[in-house]
Amino acid sequence: ERHGTRVTFKPDPEMFEDTVYDYEILRTRMREEAFLNAGLQIRIADLRAEEPQEETMRYAGGIREFVTYLNRSKDPIHSQIVYMAGTKGDSMAEVAFQYHDGYNETILSFANNVHTPEGGMHEEGFKRALTTVLNAYGRKIKMLKDEEKISGEDCREGLTCVISVKLTEAQFEGQTKAKLGNSEIRTLVNNIVSDKLEAFLEENPQVGRMILD
């Protein structure tokens, strides 16, 4: 027996100049939701055209598969997606990343499934921990001298990363919710990445060397 709730949205022409839905924009957003909620199945259909479009999205791997999707046209330098997650109280954070052989940096961050294009505390926590861990690991395996230090920008060269945090009282900066301001999330993400990335590099030294090379 099928059950559930159906919600219908109809744009008010008095409020919006354009009341025609853009299928590609909606499709992109639904894909994000499916990636951010592992196992959730979303079906999107556009029945307006003579040849209707329909797609079902479900990603058991969650943000791991999101990173794979973002790197689909790139050449990763390591096959394994680095994944870390943790909780503290009512807050949860997960991070997935992979390096490719290009130079550009791509970090997509989300808070309660809301895209934060200007970053915020969750991105700050990740960047700080990534730089600290890679420098410490580089010195440990003698790829860096004691006085050498890799800059944060260099640590993120060729990086594709997705950060997703869930929290009960998200504090967004600005009306567009473009930036997350919860300082406790910076600490949570920093601690997760610091602990789990260090352990990952110890268990996968070949990946660590590829990243640092």
Descriptions of predicted regions:
Residues 1-213:
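GHKL-family ATPase ATP-binding module
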